[in-house]
Amino acid sequence: MKKGTVLNSDISSVISRLGHTDTLVVCDAGLPIPKSTTRIDMALTQGVPSFMQVLGVVTNEMQVEAAIIAEEIKHHNPQLHETLLTHLEQLQKHQGNTIEIRYTTHEQFKQQTAESQAVIRSGECSPYANIILCAGVTF
């Protein structure tokens, strides 16, 4: 369910069509995107826009119930991992709900992207900067 406004019509459209438990991926520039999944490519150049910039816009618009992250981020990108956890904690407070955080292997993560409504590609060029967001409801 949509919560606010976003200028990108593709992102706005996909969020408006999400039902409870549907998923949406925000990823770095390197994640392989299945041909069967809608690709929304925001990448302009390396690092632009960043993963966190795209995630911030998406989570301002989308009610999030759960998040799936690759286990490997903990060791290969600990700074982004901490930033991501802080963002999700702040989002919980803003939304007034608990966001379940699940970890999986990167290989399983890539397989799960095929089930998502869309994959939004950022310009991020740091390892494992990817998240699967599970839609919640606003009531």
UniProtKB/Swiss-Prot annotation:
Homodecamer. Pathway: Carbohydrate metabolism; D-ribose degradation; D-ribose 5-phosphate from beta-D-ribopyranose: step 1/2. The active site is at 20 (proton donor). It comes from the Bacteria. It holds the Pfam family RbsD_FucU. It catalyses: beta-D-ribopyranose = beta-D-ribofuranose; beta-D-allofuranose = beta-D-allopyranose. It is found in: Cytoplasm. Substrate binds at residues 28, 106, 128-130. Its EC number is 5.4.99.62. Keywords: Carbohydrate metabolism, Cytoplasm, Isomerase. The lineage of its organism: Bacteria, Pseudomonadati, Pseudomonadota, Gammaproteobacteria, Enterobacterales. This is D-ribose pyranase. One of its GO terms (cellular component) is cytosol. SUPFAM superfamilies: RbsD-like. It comes from Escherichia coli (strain K12). The gene is rbsD. GO terms for biological process: D-ribose catabolic process. Catalyzes the interconversion of beta-pyran and beta-furan forms of D-ribose. It also catalyzes the conversion between beta-allofuranose and beta-allopyranose. PANTHER family: D-RIBOSE PYRANASE. The keyword Cell inner membrane does not apply. GO terms for molecular function: D-ribose pyranase activity; identical protein binding; intramolecular lyase activity; intramolecular transferase activity; monosaccharide binding. Belongs to the RbsD / FucU family. RbsD subfamily.
